[in-house]
């Protein structure tokens, strides 16, 4: 199971109170890393995909510096940032150059899968915990899109003229709201919430995985809602 090998350090940051230990701050940071950049990354990648992808370099550099020279929680933020860097780069690659090919989404997002799995057994376990949970959330979202019949609309929306894309998104919204699809999405959400709960109970890096998975699902849902309700401001079209 993700991140079961070692518990998180209980040392706090200089500004952290007794309740803001690693068990709270690291999952909270994971949530912020998932949520904060998403609605900024989509339009940035659309306008300057190469610049967005190259931003991975300073992210990784900062992560390595933290891991090697940081102390306490600062050191643990390094591997967490490495995991985020992998997800960031994958998103830039797909949405920058392959966005009209939905079948390539998951393979591109999984480009660092071997490294993430290998990292679970060493000092980069937090990187693997974050990346793998983010990948699982992405896989769940793509599966839901495929099972609800939205996958064929994906390339149509992205390649359509600006005047037609909102209409296609409205059609997608109507498809999602069909009773069978609502039941399917609800069942998948309940299953994944159960997975998050089990990971959270394990503590350690698994708690980071739980927070990352939950945040990924929530953000994907919000992004889909934004695309359906306010397509021009979502960065999708």
Write out the residue ranges for each language-model feature.
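Juxtamembrane membrane-water interface segments that cap and precede transmembrane helices
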Residues: 6-13, 31-37, 161-175
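Membrane-proximal helix-loop-helix units in multi-pass membrane proteins
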Residues: 98-167
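Hydrophobic, membrane-inserted alpha-helices
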Residues: 32-37, 59, 86-93, 109-118, ...
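C-terminal membrane-adjacent module
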Residues: 138-237
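Transmembrane alpha-helical segments of multi-pass membrane proteins
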Residues: 78-93, 136-139, 211-220
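Transmembrane alpha-helical insertion/packing segments
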Residues: 11-97
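Membrane-helix interface "capping/anchor" motifs
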Residues: 69-79, 97-103, 120-130, 200-207
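Cytoplasm-facing juxtamembrane segments at the starts of transmembrane helices
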Residues: 16-29, 102, 124-141, 203-216
């Amino acid at each position: 199971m993700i991140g079961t090998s070692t518990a998180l350090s209980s040392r706090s940051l200089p500004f952290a109170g007794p309740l803001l230990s690693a068990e709270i701050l690291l999952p909270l940071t994971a949530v912020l890393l998932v949520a904060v950049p998403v609605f900024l990354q989509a339009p940035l990648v659309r306008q300057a995909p190469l610049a967005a992808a190259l931003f991975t370099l300073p992210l990784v550099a900062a992560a390595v510096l933290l891991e090697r020279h940081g102390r306490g929680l600062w050191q643990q933020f390094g591997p967490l940032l490495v995991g985020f860097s992998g997800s960031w780069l994958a998103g830039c690659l797909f949405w920058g150059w392959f966005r009209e090919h939905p079948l390539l989404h998951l393979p591109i997002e999984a480009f660092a899968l071997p490294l993430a799995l290998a990292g679970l057994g060493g000092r980069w376990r937090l990187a693997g915990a974050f990346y793998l949970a983010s990948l699982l959330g992405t896989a769940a979202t793509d599966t839901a899109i495929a099972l609800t019949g939205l996958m064929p609309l994906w390339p149509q929306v992205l390649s359509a003229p600006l005047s037609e894309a909102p209409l296609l998104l409205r059609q997608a919204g109507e498809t999602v709201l069909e009773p069978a699809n609502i039941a399917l999405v609800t069942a998948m959400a309940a299953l994944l919430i159960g997975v998050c709960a089990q990971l959270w109970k394990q503590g350690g890096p698994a708690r980071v995985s739980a927070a990352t998975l939950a945040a990924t699902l929530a953000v994907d849902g919000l992004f889909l809602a934004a695309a359906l309700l306010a397509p021009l401001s979502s960065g999708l079209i």
